[in-house]
C-alpha cells in the first residue's frame, strides 16, 4: 500500500534506513499469576528437509474461456488428481481454488496439460452450465451456442499446471525463530491453504447446502429458520497456523457471518425492503442489494452472478437474436422482447414479473436478461453489504457464546475436521495436538480513580459508578435548549430529569431556555429540510451554547448527520443526540458524562495521573496520539475513508483529547496525509496536534494487519518525524527531537482465553489479564490484554504490538500504561477493551464521516469496476468554537 500524497511529501524525499518492528526486551512480572487455556493447539513438525513446490494453475473451459468460480476450480482439480494420479507421481497437493497449487515434492514435469471431463461441474456440486450470453441456457441476450453441443451434465475442462518456484520446508524453522522472510511466510501459507482445501472438501461432502461462505474456513450446520428476514446468520470456523515463542500452533475459532436467505428473488426483495406488495419495490435499492449475488434458474438449473437490472421491464426490454436461414442464406437478426422470447422459446407465460425489470447476469457491454420469477438465490452466500441496526444486533446475539459453550464447539470442530488425517499434512510430517494450550498469565490490579469530592473510586470487576461520588471537573450546563424530533418523547420531562440527575452528580445544569418541538408537517420531509427548519426556530433567539437533540429513532437516523454538521461545522454549537427508550438514573448519568466531556470537563482521573506518578509520562512532557480510519459500508469501495488522529491535551493529563480528521482514498488503512509540504495548513492533519505540543510522543494505532507493520513505521511514523523536523525549523529549534513509542492495537484476531473456576466451570478471564508469553510472537514485542470484564459471550482480548520504543519503557511500565488508558474513557464507568485514544479516534472518524453522508452519495450507484475513481472530497472544517473540544465523546 502506498501513500498517495502530493509531490514533495516525505515518501518522495531521500529515504532513511528502513525501520523494522522492534524485538522483545523481556517479559512483564507485575500482577497475580494465573493459568489459562487458549484456542491454540500445538503443532509438531517432524520434517524439515524437503521443499514445497509452487505451481501455477490455469483452468479453462473447452473453448478457452477462463473458469473464475473457486468452487468449480476446486472440483475440477480434485477430479484431475483422481484421474491423473500416476501422471502427478501420486503427489498430494494443496490448491487455493485460484492460480496456486503446492506439493511437498516435485511433479514429474515442469509443465503439464490435462483434459478433465466432469459430469457435475457446478460450484455447488449440482448440474449446471457455464454462464453464457446465448439463449440456449434460457437467458436471452446473445448467440453463443458452442458450449451447449455437449449434454448439459457433461463438461470438458482444460487444465495447465506449470512450475513457478520452490521453498524449503526449513523456512518453517526460520519463522519460529522470528525470521520472517518471504520463504518462511510462503511455507506457512501453504499449510493454511492445505487446511482451507480440506475444509472446502469437507463442507461439500457433508453439507446439504451447496457451498459455504468463502470468508470462513468451514461451516457448521446450525439450522436455517423457515420464517424471518432476508438475511440469516451462519456459524463457521476460522483456522490458521501461527508462529509463537513456544513453537508452531494452530489457532481455531468460531466465526459467524450474515448470509443471504436462499429462495425466490422476489421474496428476498420484499423482506429486504420490509414491504408486502411487489409493486412497491424500490428498484434502485433492489439493484444495490442484488449486485454480485448468485442465482439459479428454475427452468434450466443454471447458475449466474447478478451484475445489475435491465433498464426496461421484462415486457418491454428488447434484445437482438440471430435466426438461421434454412435456405442457406445469411442469418437474420431479429429484435424481440424478453417476455416474448420466453413465451415462444420456453413456453413460459410470465405472470409474476412481466412488469418488473429483469436480472442482468451477462457483462456490462453484453447483457443477459432473466425474468425475476425464474430466479432463486442459491444458499450460503455471504452478505457483504451494510447491515441495519436490527441485523447487526441479531448477528451479535447469534455470535455470542459463553466460554464453556465455545470450548465445547471448538473441541467438536477439531475432532470433526480430523486434520491429522489430511494427506498433505501427513506428507509434511505435521501433526496437531487435540488439547487446548495452557499459558501463563497475570492479572494487573485496577488503577484507583479520583472523584470530585476527593474520594478514591475503586473499580470492581472493571466497573465503578457515581452513585455516591461527584464528577472531578464539572462544567456548568448553561444557555442550553432542547430540540425534539420525536413525537414519542416528552422533552420537558426529559429536561427536568436531566437537571435533577446532574445536580446529584455535582454537575450543575441550569433550567433549559427553551424546548423546540418539530412542526407536525415536517415529519415526512427530507432530513436536511427538517434540520434547516429546526435551526430557523433555534436561531430565532440568542445562540445557545449547548443543544440536547432528541432523535426519533436509535442508530442510523437520517437526521443525525445533517444535524451534527450544522452544529459542529456551521455554528460551532456543542450538541448531544439521544433517542431514549427507557429513562432511568443510569441512562441519564451516561448522558451527563458525555455532555460534561464535550463541554470541556472531566468525569474522573486516575490517581497516578492526578499525582503525576505515571512512569516516564509524568516526568517528561508527552503527547499521546490515537489513530484510526473509518471506511465506507461493506461493498462501497467508491466511498472515501475518513482518517482521524486524536491527541492528548493539558499534559500531564492523559484523559483529555482533541481530534483532527481528513478524507483519503477508499479502503486505505494507512493515513497518507499525516504530513504534507503544502501551503494550506488545514491539510496537515498532524500539525494541529504538534502545534499544541513540543516534546516526546506515544502513538497508538488501530485496524492494522501484521503485514502492514512496516508501513506504519516507514510511512506514518516517518511522516510524523518529518512534521516534527518541519516544526522545529519553523521554531528555529534545532535541538527539539522528540522520542517516539509506537503501539498497534489489533481486535480483528481469533485468539481467546478461558479460565476454569473452583467448580471446574469454564469462565471468562478477569479484567486486567495480560499474556506476553506462550502464544506471542517468537521475536517481536507483543502481548494480549483483556482490560475489560466480559459480561456476555467470550471476552476478546486486544493484541498489542510494540513496533518502536525510543523511550525505553520496561515491559511492566508499558503494559500498565496500556491498562491505565483503558480506564480514562470519559463516556462510561467501565474499563474498555482497548485504549481510550484509539476509541476516540474511531468515534471522531465515524462521526465526521456522517457530516457529508458519503454513504448516501454512493448508494445511488453500485461502484461498477469500470467506472473511473472519484476524486476524494475534502471534509468541512470544524467551527473554531468546537475544534478543541471532545465533540466526538
Curated annotation (Swiss-Prot):
Superkingdom to which the source organism belongs: Eukaryota
A Gene Ontology cellular-component term: nucleus
Entry keyword annotation includes 4Fe-4S: no
Domain PAZ: 264-379
UniProt keyword annotations, A-Z: RNA-mediated gene silencing
The keyword Transmembrane helix belongs to this UniProt entry's keyword annotation: no
SUPFAM superfamilies named among the record's database cross-references: PAZ domain (SSF101690), Ribonuclease H-like (SSF53098)
Skewed-composition ranges (Low complexity): 122-132
Family according to the record: Belongs to the argonaute family. Ago subfamily.
Protein function: Probably involved in the RNA silencing pathway. May bind to short RNAs such as microRNAs (miRNAs) or short interfering RNAs (siRNAs), and represses the translation of mRNAs which are complementary to them.
Name of protein: Protein argonaute 15
Native organism: Oryza sativa subsp. japonica
Amino acid at each position: 500500500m502506498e501513500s498517495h500524497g502530493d509531490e514533495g511529501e516525505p515518501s518522495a524525499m531521500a529515504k532513511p534506513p528502513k525501520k523494522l518492528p522492534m524485538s522483545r526486551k523481556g517479559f512483564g512480572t507485575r500482577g497475580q499469576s494465573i493459568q489459562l487455556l487458549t484456542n491454540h493447539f500445538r503443532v509438531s513438525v517432524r520434517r524439515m528437509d524437503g521443499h514445497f513446490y509452487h505451481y501455477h494453475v490455469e483452468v479453462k473451459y473447452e473453448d478457452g474461456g477462463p473458469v473464475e468460480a473457486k468452487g468449480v476450480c476446486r472440483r475440477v482439480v480434485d477430479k484431475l488428481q483422481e484421474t491423473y494420479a500416476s501422471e502427478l507421481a501420486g503427489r498430494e497437493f494443496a490448491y487455493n481454488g485460484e492460480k496456486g497449487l503446492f506439493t511437498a515434492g516435485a511433479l514429474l514435469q515442469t509443465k503439464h496439460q490435462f483434459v478433465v471431463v466432469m459430469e457435475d461441474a457446478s460450484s455447488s456440486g449440482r448440474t449446471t452450465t457455464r454462464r453464457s450470453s446465448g439463449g440456449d441456457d434460457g437467458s436471452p441476450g446473445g448467440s453463443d451456442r458452442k458450449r451447449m453441443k455437449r449434454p448439459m451434465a457433461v463438461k470438458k475442462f482444460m487444465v495447465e499446471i506449470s512450475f513457478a518456484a520452490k521453498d524449503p520446508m526449513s523456512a518453517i524453522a526460520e519463522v519460529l525463530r522470528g525470521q520472517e522472510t518471504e520463504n518462511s511466510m510462503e511455507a506457512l501459507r501453504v499449510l493454511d491453504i492445505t487446511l482451507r482445501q480440506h475444509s472446502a472438501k469437507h463442507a461439500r461432502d457433508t453439507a446439504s447446502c451447496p457451498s459455504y461462505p468463502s470468508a470462513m474456513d468451514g461451516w457448521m450446520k446450525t439450522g436455517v429458520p423457515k420464517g424471518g428476514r432476508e438475511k440469516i446468520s451462519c456459524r463457521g470456523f476460522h483456522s490458521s497456523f501461527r508462529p509463537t515463542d513456544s513453537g508452531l500452533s494452530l489457532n481455531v475459532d468460531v466465526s459467524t457471518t450474515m448470509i443471504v436467505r436462499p429462495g425466490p428473488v422476489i421474496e428476498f426483495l420484499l423482506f429486504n425492503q420490509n414491504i408486502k406488495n411487489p409493486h412497491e419495490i424500490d428498484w434502485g435499492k433492489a439493484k444495490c442489494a442484488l449486485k454480485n449475488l448468485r442465482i439459479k434458474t428454475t427452468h434450466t438449473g443454471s447458475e449466474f452472478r447478478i451484475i445489475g437490472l435491465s433498464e426496461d421491464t421484462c415486457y418491454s426490454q428488447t434484445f437482438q437474436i440471430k435466426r438461421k436461414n434454412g435456405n442457406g442464406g445469411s442469418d437474420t437478426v431479429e429484435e424481440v422482447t424478453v417476455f416474448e422470447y420466453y413465451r415462444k422459446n420456453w413456453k413460459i407465460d410470465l405472470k409474476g414479473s412481466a412488469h418488473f425489470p429483469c436480472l442482468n447476469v451477462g457483462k456490462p457491454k453484453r447483457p443477459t436478461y432473466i425474468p425475476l420469477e425464474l430466479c432463486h438465490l442459491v444458499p450460503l452466500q455471504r452478505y457483504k453489504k451494510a447491515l441495519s441496526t436490527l441485523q447487526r444486533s441479531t448477528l451479535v446475539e447469534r455470535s455470542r457464546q459463553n466460554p464453556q459453550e465455545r470450548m465445547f464447539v471448538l473441541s467438536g470442530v477439531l475432532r470433526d475436521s480430523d486434520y491429522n488425517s489430511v494427506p498433505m499434512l501427513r506428507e509434511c510430517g505435521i501433526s496437531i495436538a487435540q488439547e487446548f494450550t495452557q499459558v501463563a498469565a497475570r492479572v494487573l490490579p485496577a488503577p484507583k480513580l479520583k472523584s470530585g469530592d476527593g474520594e478514591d473510586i475503586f473499580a470492581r470487576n472493571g466497573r465503578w459508578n457515581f452513585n455516591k461520588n461527584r464528577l472531578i471537573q464539572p462544567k456548568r450546563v448553561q444557555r442550553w435548549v432542547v430540540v425534539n424530533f420525536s413525537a414519542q418523547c416528552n422533552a420537558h420531562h426529559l429536561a427536568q430529569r436531566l437537571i435533577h440527575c446532574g445536580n446529584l452528580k455535582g454537575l450543575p445544569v441550569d433550567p433549559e431556555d427553551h424546548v423546540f418541538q418539530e412542526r407536525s408537517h415536517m415529519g415526512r420531509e427530507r432530513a436536511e429540510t427538517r434540520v434547516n427548519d429546526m435551526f430557523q426556530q433555534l436561531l430565532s433567539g440568542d445562540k445557545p451554547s449547548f443543544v440536547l437533540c432528541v432523535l426519533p429513532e436509535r442508530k442510523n437516523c437520517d437526521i443525525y448527520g445533517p444535524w451534527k454538521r450544522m452544529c459542529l461545522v456551521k455554528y460551532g454549537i456543542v450538541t448531544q443526540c439521544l433517542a431514549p427508550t427507557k429513562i432511568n438514573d443510569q441512562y441519564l448519568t451516561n448522558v451527563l458524562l458525555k455532555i460534561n466531556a464535550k463541554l470541556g470537563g472531566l468525569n474522573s482521573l486516575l490517581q497516578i495521573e492526578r499525582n503525576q506518578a505515571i512512569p516516564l509520562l509524568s516526568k517528561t512532557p508527552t503527547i499521546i496520539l490515537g489513530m484510526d480510519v473509518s471506511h465506507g459500508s461493506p461493498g462501497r469501495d467508491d466511498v472515501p475513508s475518513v482518517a482521524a488522529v486524536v491527541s492528548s491535551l493539558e499534559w500531564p493529563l492523559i484523559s483529555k483529547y482533541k481530534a483532527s480528521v481528513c478524507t483519503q482514498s477508499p479502503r486505505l488503512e494507512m493515513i497518507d496525509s499525516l504530513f504534507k509540504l503544502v501551503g494550506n495548513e488545514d491539510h496537515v492533519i498532524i500539525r494541529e496536534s504538534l502545534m499544541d505540543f513540543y516534546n516526546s510522543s506515544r502513538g497508538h494505532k488501530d485496524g492494522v494487519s501484521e503485514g502492514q507493520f512496516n508501513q506504519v513505521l516507514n510511512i506514518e511514523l516517518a511522516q510524523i518525524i518529518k512534521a516534527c523536523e518541519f516544526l522545529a525549523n519553523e521554531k528555529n529549534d534545532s535541538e527539539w527531537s522528540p522520542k517516539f513509542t509506537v503501539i498497534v492495537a489489533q481486535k480483528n484476531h481469533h485468539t481467546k482465553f478461558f479460565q476454569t473456576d473452583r467448580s471446574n466451570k469454564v469462565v471468562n478471564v478477569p479484567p486486567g489479564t495480560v499474556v506476553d508469553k506462550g502464544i506471542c510472537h517468537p521475536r517481536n514485542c507483543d502481548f494480549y490484554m483483556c482490560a475489560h470484564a466480559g459480561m456476555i459471550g467470550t471476552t476478546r482480548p486486544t493484541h498489542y504490538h510494540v513496533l518502536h520504543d525510543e523511550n525505553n519503557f520496561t515491559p511492566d511500565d508499558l503494559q500498565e500504561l496500556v491498562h491505565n488508558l483503558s480506564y480514562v474513557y470519559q463516556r462510561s464507568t467501565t474499563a474498555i477493551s482497548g485504549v481510550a485514544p484509539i476509541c476516540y479516534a474511531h468515534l471522531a472518524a465515524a462521526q465526521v464521516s456522517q457530516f457529508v453522508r458519503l454513504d448516501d452519495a454512493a448508494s445511488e450507484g453500485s461502484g461498477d469496476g469500470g467506472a473511473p475513481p472519484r476524486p476524494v472530497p475534502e471534509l468541512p472544517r470544524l467551527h473554531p468554537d468546537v475544534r478543541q473540544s471532545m465533540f466526538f465523546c
